[in-house]
Structures are given as C-alpha cells and as structure tokens.
Design a protein with these regions (language model features):
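Soluble extramembrane regions of membrane proteins in the secretory/endomembrane system
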Residues: 17-346
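Transmembrane alpha-helical segments and their cytosolic interface motifs
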Residues: 16, 345-356
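Alpha-helical transmembrane segments of integral membrane proteins
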Residues: 2-10, 352-480
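Membrane-interface motif at the C-terminal end of an N-terminal transmembrane signal
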Residues: 3-24
Length: 480
C-alpha cells in the first residue's frame, strides 16, 4: 500500500509538472501615480512617450486607482469649500456668489458641510449616487439655486465626502491603452459594501478594455464583510481574477479566494517605506524570488521610488534587467493568469490511495514500537482508516492537512530507522563492508525522504496551496 501511495503521488507529480510548465507568464505592473512622478524625474515631455518606454522595458500593465472627490471636482472645474471656511471668509470679506449669499443671509450655512460651485443637477445626481456607497446612512446632497447660480451642499461628518469614489479617470485609462499597455483597476471597498454599491463600482470596469485582474486598495477585500459571496459571483461572471498581495492581510481576502475557487493572481509589491532601505540588487533578487519560489505572477512596481536607489542607469533599465532575468529562467512577459486548473484530474481518485499509504506507514511504526499479531494489526489499520474517513467527511481540507502532517512527521523517523538503527522489520540487509553498508543505509534514507515528500506534495496538489491561500507547515513540524 505504501508503494501504491508513492506511485500515485508520482502520477500526480507528472500532471503538476505539465501544469507548471504552462504557468510561466509574469506581468510587470507599474502604479500610474508613480509612473507620472517618474516621467517627471526623467524629464519626459509627455506621459504617452514615457509609457511607451515602459512597455519597451518589459512593463505589461499600469495600475489605475479610482478617482477621489478632489480629482473628480478638479476634472470638472468645480471648487470646494468647507462651511467653516465660508463663514470665516464672509466675516472678513462679503461673499458675492448669489446662491451662497442667499444661504449666508438666511443662516443656513453649516460649518460641517462641504459646498461645491458651480453646481448643477447632473453633478448633484452623481454625488448623490456616490453617497449611497458610503456607510449605512447615505450622506445628504442638496442643490441650492438663486437666480441663474447654484451651489451643491454635501452634509457630512468630517471627511466622509472626501472618501467618495467616482470610477476611473477616462484620460488615464485612454493614455495607458494608447501606449499598448493593459489597465489593472485598483478597487476600494465601498463603505456600505451593499450589493447596489458593489454593482455601481463594477459598472465602471466597462470603461476598461480586456480587464482580467483587479487589485484591492485599503484594508478590506472588495465586498467585505457581508457580500463576499455576491462579489465572487460577479467576478467569476465577468472573468476577472482578484489579485492577492502577499504579506498583506485584507479583511475577507481568504474567504473571497475560496469563493472564486482560488482563481486568484498572486502579487508581490515592495511597500513604499521599504524602497529606501533596499539596494538595486536586493530589489532585483527579491522580485525574482517572489516569482520563482512563491508562485507570484504579478510584480507591482513604483519606479519613482526605485530611481533614487540606483547607482547606474535608471528605473527603466532596472525593469529591463528584471525582465531579462525572468526570461532567462524560462518565464514569459504577458498578462498574469490564475493557475491553469483547480487540481490535477487524478487527484480526487488517488488521494484515498495516498491516505491508505499514510495509514500503512503509521501501522508500520507502531509495530516497531509495539509488535502485535496480525488480527490486532488489521484492527489498528481499520480504526486509523475510519478516523481519516470521519475527518474527511467533516472537512476534506483538514483531513488532507492532517494526513500531510502525519507523513511529514513519520517519514524522518522511518528514514532514521532504516539508515541508522537498521531494524530488520523495516529493512533487510546483508552483511558486508561497513562503508558499503553505510552507503546503502544512506541511500535508503534518501529514498524514504524523497518518497515521503512526493506523497505530501501529491496530497496537497491543488490551486489553494499553489496560491498560498492555504499553507502547510508540516515541514517545520517535522523538524521540531
């Protein structure tokens, strides 16, 4: 049975190798705001020419954030004033704007409100729609008119209105697309996270061509905490994979990953505060290892922060070096994709075989410690198998983790027994030269260790582990 378990694991390993050989596309993504700052650092006269240079260096996409209220108003040529600013200004110099003057004369200017001018019904409607995404209690939006002039009042507590989101800047999206680069939207979770708010945000993705990946900003996964299932359904329906930034915990991200069947993109991003303490070589090594060791497939860069750390060349050269290193190791630059399949096709039917192999290994160790007749051996194996089936009935993932942990702990013990103790019940050998005997024992121990590792890898061969959403710490346990 142990031999069958090892053979089953080898079969799954072949399938995994076939999948891994197709999972080699890496996407280098640059933050738009950082790109803007870097273009200024290098003295480019237009963003278009800078983005073209980025593409030549190996960049595939640009991360674009949702438009906040300040940028939205600037784009529309609208000025914003807090109520306390207006009252203080009017105390020194009389405000002449007719609609504001009317409110001031009637004592209707609220210190906590935000006033926008010029106002118009269309803008008021957009702001009212945006307010529905904020908190459970929508922020009141009022249009005040006096003659031909008007002003919009947003009643809010503190900076609530400044948190309004208005989709994506069409100019930014178009500029990126014209350069032949892909847009990766960055989504902020609406404060209310209601279904209507989620739909409103996702509707803005219609402005982004070939959107296949989104990255979440802030401390929460999109749709958290109550509508993650709905969000997952919409993302699957739209063919969009959520990005999971490693080492960054966002509320609800693991649950969302599970709901989309772990069809996620692993992302590595050097946080802004880390750039200043890393050399160019350290950054290059870190980014490459993220891809080669941890299945990261999207590298999120901020070139304006890379630039000061370079002794030679510029950040465009750095990105080109990163691309060269990746391509030299068999990777291909392009849009990132989730792992090809949820799991190898033969995983489900072969997991029980590997589980029985783990049970047989357990019985073998027990027999070494406490020899027993055949009938009790069968009873022990039956009870152990029944325990595995019971746990699997309650939670298949937990059963696989426990089986893997058991194998990871038992295999080193067996390796020691067959190579050092040389107990006849676990290995048979002929007398010979001590060096030859030692070499045989060592080779047998290596075989046992490799076989055990193969079985553990086989049991854990699915996308949840490749994406690092679910992690197995059995190797550490086996060394404690």
């Amino acid at each position: 049975m142990i031999a069958l378990a090892v053979i089953s694991a080898a079969v799954i390993a072949v399938e995994r190798w076939a999948d891994d050989s197709r999972y080699v596309t890496v996407e280098i993504c640059v933050e738009y705001e950082s790109a803007l700052a870097h273009a200024d650092q290098l003295g480019y006269d237009s963003m278009q020419s800078y983005l073209s240079a980025l593409k030549e260096s190996g960049v595939v996409s640009v991360g674009v954030s949702q438009v906040a209220l300040a940028d939205f108003l600037l784009e529309r040529g609208v000025s914003a004033f807090h109520g306390d600013e207006l009252l203080d200004h009017d105390a020194l110099t009389s405000v002449q704007h007719p609609a504001l003057r009317s409110l001031l004369d009637r004592g209707l200017v609220n210190r906590d409100s935000l006033y926008l001018l010029p106002g118009d019904p269309e803008l008021a409607l957009l702001l009212e729609s945006a307010s529905l995404k904020e908190a459970d209690r929508p922020t009141a939006v009022r249009l005040h008119t006096s003659g031909t002039s008007s002003v919009i009042e947003i009643l809010s507590d503190g900076p609530v209105a400044e948190g309004f989101q208005f989709g994506f800047c069409k100019h930014q999206v178009q500029t990126v697309a014209d350069a032949g680069l892909k847009v990766v939207p960055r989504l902020m979770n609406p404060k209310s996270a209601s279904i209507d708010a989620i739909d409103a945000v996702l509707a803005h993705l219609d402005d982004v061509e070939e959107c296949t990946t989104v990255i979440f900003s802030g401390t929460e996964a999109f749709g958290s905490p109550h509508n993650l299932r709905y969000t997952a359904g919409r993302l699957l329906e739209m063919g969009i994979a959520p990005g999971m930034v490693e080492f960054s915990v966002q509320a609800g991200d693991r649950q969302l990953a599970q709901l989309v069947d772990y069809e996620v993109i692993r992302i590595h991003s050097i946080v802004p505060s880390e750039y200043s303490v890393l050399s160019a070589r350290e950054m290059l090594d870190r980014l490459f290892r993220a891809v080669s060791e941890r299945n990261v497939r999207l590298l999120y860069l901020r070139p304006h922060l890379i630039e000061p750390q370079l002794e030679d060349g510029n950040a465009l050269d750095f990105i080109n070096s990163l691309r060269y290193r990746l391509e030299s190791n068999g990777y291909v630059m392009g849009p990132a994709q989730a792992y090809p399949r949820s799991s190898p096709r033969l995983l489900e039917p072969l997991v029980p075989v590997m589980a029985l192999g783990a049970v047989a290994l357990f019985v073998l160790i027990v027999l070494y410690v406490y020899p027993m007749p055949a009938l009790p051996q069968v009873g022990l194996a039956f009870v152990a198998s029944l325990a595995v089936v019971g746990i699997a009935y309650l939670d298949k993932l937990l059963a696989r983790l426990l089986l893997s942990l058991g194998v990871a702990v038992m295999v080193p013990a067996v390796a020691v027994l067959v190579s050092v103790v040389r107990v006849s019940g676990l290995s048979t050998r002929r007398a010979g030269h001590p060096l030859i005997s030692a070499l045989r024992g060592w080779l047998l121990a290596v075989f046992v260790a490799v076989a055990g590792g193969l079985v553990v890898a086989g049991i854990l061969s699915d996308r949840s582990f490749f994406s690092k959403i679910v992690q197995f710490l059995g190797v550490k346990a086996s060394h404690t």
